[in-house]
Amino acid sequence: MLRIGNGYDVHKLVEGRKLMLGGVEVPHTKGVLGHSDGDVLLHAITDAIIGALGLGDIGLHFPDNDENLKDIDSAILLKKINNIMKEKNYKIVNLDSIIVMQKPKLRPYIDSIRDNIAKILEINSELINVKAKTEEKLGFTGDETGVKSYCVVLLEKKKC
């Protein structure tokens, strides 16, 4: 059986915070404001896997008012959902994601981001694609006040 999930996340950019994308700290003058570390890419991936499993969304599993999750590394959240996916006997067939922000240019970081996601999910990096886009200076990503990410994931039930 195959299952598809879509994920999405958005956060405000502010000074004085780290910019975490795919578990990699990207040098920038602004970082992400969020209850956790605000890693929009890992949140979108987590949300996509949750959706593919039919288990709601990321907010259901990790509410933004839970003080135990304050400033938590988003990789921990993704690992928890990855474990649930494995317990349900699913594996990732393909993961395609997009990070949308005006600056900084992310091309130099894409390979390390992809490799880190593969490490977190314990899969081959060839199953993962990460793209970076701008919105041509339009909207909140264009005026550099926010960042967003999308992800689609294809899961396959393992043969017993």
Curated annotation (Swiss-Prot):
Required cofactor names = a divalent metal cation
Q: Which domain of life is it from?
A: Bacteria
> Which chemical reaction does it catalyze?
4-CDP-2-C-methyl-D-erythritol 2-phosphate = 2-C-methyl-D-erythritol 2,4-cyclic diphosphate + CMP
The enzyme's E.C. designation: 4.6.1.12
| UniProt subunit comment | Homotrimer.
InterPro entries according to UniProt: MECDP_synthase, MECDP_synthase_CS, MECDP_synthase_sf
Explain how, and how many, cofactor molecules are bound. Binds 1 divalent metal cation per subunit.
> At which positions is 4-CDP-2-C-methyl-D-erythritol 2-phosphate bound?
9-11, 35-36, 57-59, 62-66, 140
List, in alphabetical order, the GO biological process terms annotated in this UniProt record: isopentenyl diphosphate biosynthetic process, methylerythritol 4-phosphate pathway; terpenoid biosynthetic process
Q: What does this protein do?
A: Involved in the biosynthesis of isopentenyl diphosphate (IPP) and dimethylallyl diphosphate (DMAPP), two major building blocks of isoprenoid compounds. Catalyzes the conversion of 4-diphosphocytidyl-2-C-methyl-D-erythritol 2-phosphate (CDP-ME2P) to 2-C-methyl-D-erythritol 2,4-cyclodiphosphate (ME-CPP) with a corresponding release of cytidine 5-monophosphate (CMP).
Binding positions for a divalent metal cation per the UniProt entry: 9, 11, 43
Family to which the UniProt record says this protein belongs: Belongs to the IspF family.
Name it. Answer: 2-C-methyl-D-erythritol 2,4-cyclodiphosphate synthase
Which SUPFAM superfamilies does the record match to this protein?
Answer: IpsF-like (SSF69765)
Q: In which pathway does it act?
A: Isoprenoid biosynthesis; isopentenyl diphosphate biosynthesis via DXP pathway; isopentenyl diphosphate from 1-deoxy-D-xylulose 5-phosphate: step 4/6
User: Which GO-annotated molecular functions does the record name?
Assistant: 2-C-methyl-D-erythritol 2,4-cyclodiphosphate synthase activity; metal ion binding
Keywords of the record: Isoprene biosynthesis, Lyase, Metal-binding
Q: Where is this site: Transition state stabilizer?
A: 35, 134
Lineage runs: Bacteria, Fusobacteriati, Fusobacteriota, Fusobacteriia, Fusobacteriales
Q: One matching Pfam family, short form?
A: YgbB
